[in-house]
Each structure stands twice: as structure tokens, then as C-alpha cells.
């Protein structure tokens, strides 16, 4: 009984978990997204039973696949949704009279804020025209350097 066969040595060398491999990042992602049984190696004698278990849809997986195409895996579906642009919400075109009146009161009749509306635009346009006419700061600096203008000491 002291001697051991070669098959006993191979079982001891690999340890008790020689058939199980360490789970990597992809395996953990697959488990997280509900594909835990897809990469298992079937054991001897249990192959038909494992196939039927793997192919039978569970309620969790069927519920999870309801919103996406069945040919996409959960990981592919996740990354497709992350990369696809979000759709802007559709604005309602028909509003009630009260909400339209409140909107006009807040935004003005032109759909702009009162500060930027027709009454306030004349002040900003006048300031802009003044700069266009050459009365801005840089223009006045350059005019100082011309002959016949500026302080008498520079003439």
C-alpha cells in the first residue's frame, strides 16, 4: 500500500482544483452580465444534462434579453448603448393657454429673455456700432500716434 500509481501522483500534483481555472476579467464580466454557465467544461457522464440546462432559458435571462436583440451578448449590448448618442427629448408642440402665457411672460413675445429682447438690443447695438466706428480703446491708442493729434508734447 506504500506504492502509488502514476494517476494518483498526477491528481496530487495538480491539487484538488486542477480542473478549475482561475477566473479572469472576462469571466467575471460574463458572470456579472448573467452568462455564468456558458464557459464551463461538461464533466464525463453528465454532458446531456448540462446541455439541456445551458440551453434552457431562465426567467432572469429572458427578462434581461427583452430589451435587446437576442444575437447580441450582454457585454456587446452594454458597450453599444454606452457609445450610441442619446436622443434629445421631443418637445410638446401643443401647449395649454396658461402655460403659453407664462412662457411669454418669462421669455418675452419673441421667445427670448427680456434682457436680450428688442428693447435691450438697441443699447448693445449702439455700443457695438461705436466700436465699429473707431472709437474703441485700440483705435484711440493708434490715433494717438498719428501726426497732428494727441498731446502738444508729442507734436
Swiss-Prot record:
Any single GO CC term annotated in Swiss-Prot or TrEMBL for this entry: myelin sheath
Membrane topology of this protein: Peripheral membrane protein
Primary site of residence: membrane
Single annotated GO MF: structural constituent of myelin sheath
Intracellular or extracellular location(s): Myelin membrane
Compositionally biased tracts (Basic and acidic residues): 37-49, 123-134
Residues modified as N-acetylalanine: 2
The UniProt record lists the keyword Acetylation: yes
Pfam assignment, any one: Myelin_MBP
Protein keywords: Acetylation, Cell membrane, Membrane, Phosphoprotein
Region (Disordered): 1-70, 109-155
Family: Belongs to the myelin basic protein family.
Functional description taken from the UniProt entry: This protein may function to maintain proper structure of myelin.
This protein's name: Myelin basic protein
Species for this entry: Heterodontus francisci
Lineage per the UniProt record: Eukaryota, Metazoa, Chordata, Craniata, Vertebrata
Gene of this entry: MBP
Amino acid at each position: 500500500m506504500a506504492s502509488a500509481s502514476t494517476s494518483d501522483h498526477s491528481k496530487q500534483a495538480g491539487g484538488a482544483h486542477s480542473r478549475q481555472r482561475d477566473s479572469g476579467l472576462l469571466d467575471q464580466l460574463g458572470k456579472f452580465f448573467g452568462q455564468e454557465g456558458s464557459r464551463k467544461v461538461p464533466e464525463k457522464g453528465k454532458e446531456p444534462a448540462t446541455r439541456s440546462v445551458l440551453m434552457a432559458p431562465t426567467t432572469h435571462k429572458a427578462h434581461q434579453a427583452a430589451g435587446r436583440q437576442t444575437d447580441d451578448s450582454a457585454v456587446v449590448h452594454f458597450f453599444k448603448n454606452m457609445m450610441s448618442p442619446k436622443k434629445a427629448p421631443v418637445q410638446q408642440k401643443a401647449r395649454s393657454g396658461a402655460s403659453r402665457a407664462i412662457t411669454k411672460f418669462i421669455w418675452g413675445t419673441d421667445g427670448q429673455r427680456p434682457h436680450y429682447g428688442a428693447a435691450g438690443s438697441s443699447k448693445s447695438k449702439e455700443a457695438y456700432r461705436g466700436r465699429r466706428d473707431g472709437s474703441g480703446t485700440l483705435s484711440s491708442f493708434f490715433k494717438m500716434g498719428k501726426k497732428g493729434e494727441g498731446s502738444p508734447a508729442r507734436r
